């Protein structure tokens, strides 16, 4: 990781403006977004803070355009032009930041990049309040993109892709998964594990829950985590114990 020198900052500004303007068509925009993402990932915290501050402070709505559109809207409230003026005001308030953020979603790992970028914002925002505008805008977009209607609920088993299983071990936030045998125990026939996934992040569980099937409530969670305990006959279960739920994405 490295910082951001003056020459690099000039080039990044150029790429950001080109991305925001959309010149050159979709393919060119995707290539520029890819270069920006690669540059960002190579930066240290100081460099990332500078990168994000440029987006936050230089790509907001144009105050003069907003003021004019608002005045036109006020003048048109009682006329047949009201809806046209309202649309113009809405467009004037739409920042270039939104166009920039949308460019990243076209990348293979673009949605995950934006989720991680917001995690950086949450870390850095205390040191630089100017980042709040970008954080709020990105939060709004992510909330829309990650609406539960767009998510896929999947059961995770021992036969799920290895990358998904590795993510369970990495992200378990309640009861640490200590080994592969520990994980296998939690995915045995008397257990269930379900996770929400986003179509653009198929190997990244967003939130997952671990369930034990039993015939009674457990006295303590350690009995559920005991790898050497006998496997319960799942068809006889009349109790489902939700013993762990993990939210995996900081952003």
PLM feature spans:
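Extended, composition-driven regions rather than compact fold-specific motifs
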Residues: 1-251
